[in-house]
A protein has these predicted regions:
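Cross-family detector of peptidyl-prolyl cis-trans isomerase
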Residues: 5-325
């Protein structure tokens, strides 16, 4: 536990937060910290990485924890810390590095400054002033927002581990998909850019073709492709699958998902409230068939991801079954 100098502030000015920072460092580190930057960041500890440096265009895969000066954890990517300190651990959360960017100003000023000091494999522990926990955009940046709301109103300790960087996130996803196809599906080719489909069970009865505009029930399980396990289940409407992955929820109704069938993929996409890749896959089926579709985030949840189960820029795989006629 840290020796805290963080008290209820008389005011929230920059100068007050600086005094709190200075006092905390003096008590806990003395002069044995690494550096004090011009912007007011105290770099407390660092471990140099041996990999590539962070470029303005880099997509940075980062494990992190945010801790206030009292030693209270506020957020983390570490499941053990979430379990021990935050009480937020859940098997339904996808625990993996976050993707932080510099070029598109989705990352706050303090984190961006720290990342630019780092190389892959490196770690840093630093106190970031609250005024650097927002995003300051350059004057020529095309946004209606000049400075975002600050993430924190007090000084915050950032513990950051830079796991890897990627220059081209689209190509990174394509490589994951290609490797996935080769590892599990005999190297099948994509049918459109970033989208793969394979029929696993075919219905030979021609009369079981689904008519355009028909509402049908489909059953599915959705998983994240990460190049490691490729098996994290983020959603299913099949009770046995939920049980197998220890995701069963007694309060959930495991029934078919009603979708409107269209043979043309673009019609299927535009007439259903589904991610593009899932809707595109439905257009490939007849009644009583099963298949697998996997695709890049451009056909899925894109740069935003979805909640705590689907990270940003995540390729996904769906196992899908259509109802019998």
């Amino acid at each position: 536990m840290f020796n805290s100098c963080e008290v209820a502030p008389v005011d929230d000015t920059v100068s007050h937060m600086k005094r709190v920072r200075d006092a905390w460092v003096k008590v806990n580190y003395g002069s044995n910290y690494v550096a004090l930057t011009k912007s007011g960041i105290y770099v407390l500890e660092e471990s140099d990485g041996s990999g590539s440096s962070v470029l303005d265009s880099s997509y940075c895969f980062v494990n992190y924890s945010m801790i206030d000066l009292d030693g209270t954890y506020k957020s983390t990517t570490d499941p053990e810390i979430a379990k021990m300190h935050l009480g937020t651990y859940s098997d339904t959360v996808y625990w993996a590095p976050s993707i932080w960017r510099i070029a598109d100003y989705t990352q706050n000023d303090g984190a961006r400054e720290l990342l630019k000091m780092m190389k892959v494999g490196g770690k840093v522990k630093a106190i970031v002033p609250p005024e650097l926990s927002g995003v300051t955009y350059p004057k020529d940046y095309k946004t209606s927002v000049v400075t975002s709301n600050k993430e924190f109103s007090v000084n915050m300790i950032y513990e950051i581990s830079l796991e890897k960087t990627v220059k081209n996130i689209e190509q990174y996803e394509f490589d994951l998909l290609k490797n996935y196809a080769e590892k599990y599906w005999n190297g099948i080719d994509s049918t459109v850019k970033g989208f793969y489909f394979l029929k696993l069970k075919e219905n030979p009865v021609e009369s079981d073709t689904i008519v355009n505009g028909t509402s049908i029930n489909v059953y599915y399980s959705g998983h994240v492709i990460d190049g490691i396990t490729d098996n994290f289940l983020f959603d299913t409407n099949i009770a046995d699958t939920a049980r197998m992955y220890r995701r069963y929820n007694k309060d959930k109704s495991y029934t078919g998902l009603s979708v409107t069938y269209y043979k043309d993929p673009e019609d299927a996409i535009s007439n259903n409230s589904l991610v593009d890749g899932f809707a595109r896959a439905i257009s490939e089926f007849k009644y009583g068939e099963e298949g697998v579709a996997f695709f890049s985030s451009s056909h899925g949840y894109k740069a935003e991801g979805s909640g705590k189960t689907i990270p940003a820029y995540s390729p996904l795989v769906f196992y899908i079954k259509t109802q019998d006629k």
